[in-house]
C-alpha cells in the first residue's frame, strides 16, 4: 500500500510539474523562451505509459495555447481552437516526447543536456520549415527556405535557452525531490 501511494505521488508530481511549466507560458518572456520543449522531453522521460507520455504534455500545451490565443493575445476575432501552423509545432513536440521516451531511460546531466540540445534543434528545424511551407512569407524554393532559416536564427537563442533552463528546472526539481518521503496521517 505504501509503495502504491509513493508511485501515485510520484506520477502526480510529474503531472503537476508539466502543468506548472505550461502555466509559466503566460509570464512575459523573451521571444521563444518557453517551457514547451522541456515539458515534452520531461513527459517523455518520466511518464512510462506511452499514452500518458504523449497525452499529458500535448494536452497541457494545447490548453495553455487556448488561454494564450483567446484571452491573452486575441489575434483572431473568433475563438481559436487551433492556430495556423500548429501542426508543425505539435509534430515537433511529439518527436521530442518520443526522444524523451526512448533516450532518457537513465537520467544524467549529460543525457538530459544532449537530448535538450537535440530537441531544440528539432523544434527549430521543423517549426521553421512549417513557416516556409506555409508559402506566405518566403519563396517556395531552396533560396526561400535558406532565407527562412536565416531569419529565424535570432529567435533560436530564446528557444535553446528556454529548453535548457526549463529542462534544468523540471528534471532538477524532480530528481532532487523524488526520494523525499512525506509522512501523512
List each language-model region with its residue ranges.
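Membrane-embedded alpha-helical hairpins and interfacial helices in multi-pass inner-membrane proteins
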Residues: 105-179
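Hydrophobic core segments of transmembrane alpha-helices in multi-pass, intramembrane catalytic enzymes
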Residues: 36-40, 88-96, 166-167
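Structural signal for the C-terminal ends of transmembrane alpha-helices
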Residues: 23, 42-49, 95-107, 173-181
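Short, charged juxtamembrane terminal tails flanking transmembrane helices
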Residues: 5-6, 178-185
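Short helix-perturbing small/polar motifs within transmembrane alpha-helices
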Residues: 74-124
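Hydrophobic transmembrane alpha-helices
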Residues: 4-46, 51-56
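Aromatic-anchored segments of alpha-helical transmembrane domains
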Residues: 18-27, 58-71, 120-129
Amino acid at each position: 500500500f505504501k509503495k502504491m501511494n509513493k508511485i501515485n505521488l510520484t506520477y502526480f508530481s510529474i503531472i503537476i510539474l508539466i502543468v506548472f511549466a505550461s502555466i509559466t507560458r503566460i509570464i512575459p518572456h523573451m521571444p521563444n523562451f518557453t517551457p514547451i520543449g522541456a515539458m515534452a522531453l520531461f513527459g517523455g522521460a518520466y511518464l512510462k505509459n506511452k499514452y500518458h507520455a504523449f497525452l499529458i504534455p500535448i494536452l497541457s500545451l494545447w490548453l495553455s495555447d487556448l488561454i494564450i490565443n483567446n484571452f491573452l493575445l486575441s489575434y483572431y476575432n473568433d475563438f481559436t481552437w487551433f492556430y495556423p501552423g500548429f501542426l508543425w509545432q505539435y509534430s515537433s513536440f511529439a518527436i521530442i516526447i518520443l526522444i524523451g521516451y526512448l533516450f532518457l531511460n537513465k537520467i544524467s546531466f549529460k543525457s538530459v543536456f544532449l537530448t535538450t540540445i537535440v530537441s531544440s534543434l528539432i523544434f527549430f528545424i521543423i517549426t521553421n520549415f512549417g513557416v516556409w511551407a506555409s508559402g506566405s512569407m518566403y519563396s517556395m524554393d531552396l533560396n526561400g527556405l535558406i532565407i527562412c532559416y536565416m531569419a529565424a536564427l535570432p529567435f533560436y537563442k530564446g528557444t535553446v535557452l528556454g529548453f535548457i533552463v526549463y529542462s534544468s528546472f523540471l528534471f532538477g526539481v524532480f530528481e532532487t525531490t523524488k526520494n523525499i518521503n512525506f509522512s501523512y496521517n
